[in-house]
Design a protein with these regions (language model features):
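Short Pro-Gly-centered beta-turn/loop motif in secreted/extracellular proteins
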Residues: 378-399, 469-490
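Bacterial Sec-dependent N-terminal signal peptides
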Residues: 1-22
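Beta-strand-rich domain onsets/edges
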Residues: 316-342
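Structured interaction patches on ligand/partner-binding surfaces of diverse proteins
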Residues: 397-423, 490-508
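A short, amphipathic beta-strand motif
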Residues: 340-350, 428-440
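Short amphipathic beta-strand segments in non-cytosolic proteins
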Residues: 355-373, 446-462
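Hydrophobic/aromatic-rich core segments of domains that either
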Residues: 26-30, 42-47, 182-199, 211-221, ...
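Secondary-structure boundary elements
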Residues: 34-38, 46-226
Length: 508
């Protein structure tokens, strides 16, 4: 993932080296939208240069930010009033949906986008900027905070695609004067964060896996009203609170877990301005900052949400070129803060017109996590790549991902080891392997060849005659140091694995 440029931080602080084109674009944006122009005029009139620079930063990075509203409607486009928080579980939710469908017919999702350029108001942005500067002055945890850190971890007026509201005022009103005094009396940002986290643990909780399908990003008031959600909701709630109270904070997360079809995971971090160190933590959990242990082995990428946009020259802005997973993605690659990483330079056998992607196996196919692009490229370059993981170079054409190389492993030394070149491929009996996942596989689980997907063996479980073993159904034998598919369709498990000579198994 290429390093993100903080657009207006550079514009304001290092204007001599920043492109004139960006300045023109910002000026044009302000001229086209009177509400934004009113913000600039307000701070110019007041003569407050610091707030004026902050206003320029927000406006320069509004870009395509906005609010997504997701509604369930009938065939006439009329809302049926669906709200996931109204149901205690999936059974109740399904019962309600069935009853509505019986009367209103087939339902479908309607998504509407409200761009901030057209819908944000001058009073809202001015309030956000003023409150951010007030808390910067008041909070001891903003001492020694640089402008760049302030712009990213205190100043932003939104955290995602939630509806716009005066959330800073709401947070401050939710805390009593004595609670605020307690927060600012702590000697460390970790203790203050833990105190705030415990308060919100009483107000919000994880709502279960059914929330994973929920696309709507809820505002601060909506989260407190609904009282439950997924990990992203918990992170958003904490970041709203922390930023409003003057604790620099943000979000990190992984899109793909190694050897899992599960959804990704997100968590928060706070910045200690004394040490200039980020302390990650799972929001609304008993383990506060300083006690975080990422429970997923070697995720390919850890990304940090940024408010600042990517460079306008990046191909990520070109939907006709870049894979949709990376389109307009302004996240910052922070993988090395969590895992051992290496930088890769891979020779290419031929030149490719489009980007070459570094991909990881997930849910039945290769999913891109990074890209390399140069019109005259003879090598693919990827930085900050997590070690001890399986990757493949892929290309994206006609809305499909195709392999551009054979799979390879990045070992603990940062070396590329192609699967076909791994030594000592030995015939083995799968039933002799002590691996827990293979031993406990369900009835009719299958092992397939990686390339051909030809079935090699199947798990046979017969309780009456206490049979529980892998049965070979192919003339081909299983071999060590070879990739295979593990398929358990009833349980929706599609992973790949490699049997090692020492009897262990690596899952990818």
């Amino acid at each position: 993932m290429k390093k993100i440029t903080l657009l207006l931080y550079v514009f304001c602080i290092c204007s001599n080296i920043y492109s004139q084109q960006i300045k023109k674009n910002v000026k044009k944006t302000i001229t086209e939208y009177p509400e934004l122009e009113a913000v600039i005029k307000h701070y110019k009139k007041n003569g407050n240069k610091e707030k004026l620079q902050a206003a320029y930063f927000l406006i320069a990075n509004i870009g395509n930010k906005g609010t997504y509203t997701n509604d369930l409607v009938d065939s006439k486009g009329i809302s049926v009033g669906y709200d996931i928080s109204n149901f205690k579980d999936e059974t109740a939710e399904k019962k309600w949906l069935d009853s509505v469908t019986a009367v209103r017919g087939k339902l479908h999702e309607k998504e509407t986008f409200l761009p901030d350029l057209k819908n944000s108001t001058a009073p809202f942005l001015i309030n956000n900027i003023d409150r951010a500067f007030e808390v910067r002055q008041k909070s001891p945890f903003c001492k020694d905070l640089t402008d760049a850190e302030f712009y990213e971890y205190i100043l932003p007026y939104r955290v995602g695609t939630e509806k716009l509201e005066y959330w800073r005022d709401q947070v401050l009103n939710d805390f009593s004067a004595s609670q605020k005094d307690s927060i600012y009396s702590f000697s460390t940002v970790l203790a203050a964060t833990s105190y705030i986290d415990k308060i919100y643990q009483k107000k919000f909780q994880f709502g279960g896996n059914r929330y994973f399908k929920e696309k709507k990003v809820r505002s601060y008031s909506e989260l407190l009203q609904d009282k439950s959600g997924k990990c992203d909701d918990m992170c958003n709630l904490m970041v709203f609170a922390l930023r409003a109270l003057g604790i620099p904070s943000g979000f990190d997360g992984i899109q793909y877990k190694r050897a899992s079809n599960d959804v990704g995971h997100g968590w928060c971090f706070v910045l200690d301005t004394k040490t200039k160190k980020n302390y990650p933590f799972d929001a609304l959990s008993n383990n506060g900052p300083g006690f975080f242990n990422l429970p997923y082995k070697n995720a390919p990428k850890v990304l940090r949400k940024q408010f600042a946009l990517i460079s306008p020259n990046s191909i990520k802005n070109d939907q006709s070129v870049i894979h949709p997973n990376l389109f307009e993605d302004n996240s910052l690659d922070v993988t090395s803060e969590y895992f051992e990483t290496t930088n890769l330079t891979i020779p290419l056998e031929k030149k490719y017109q489009g980007p070459i992607y570094l991909s990881i196996w997930n849910n039945g196919w290769w999913k891109p996590v990074d890209y390399s692009y140069d019109t005259n490229q003879t090598t693919a370059i990827f930085n900050n790549v997590s070690k001890e993981n399986l990757y493949c170079l892929t290309k994206y054409r006609y809305f499909s991902t195709e392999e551009a190389s054979e799979p390879f492993i990045i070992n603990k030394f940062g070396e590329i080891k192609h699967i076909n070149s791994l030594p000592s491929k030995k015939d083995i009996n799968l039933n002799e392997y002590k691996n827990k996942e293979l031993k406990n596989a369900k009835n009719n689980a299958k092992i397939l060849e990686f390339d051909t997907k030809k079935e090699i063996c199947k798990k046979i479980v017969e309780e009456n005659i206490t049979k529980n073993e892998w049965s070979i159904i192919s003339e081909n034998h299983l071999k060590t140091n070879t990739l295979y598919h593990f398929v358990d369709e009833p349980n929706n498990m599609y992973k790949i694995f490699l049997l090692k000579n020492d009897g262990s198994v690596d899952w990818y």
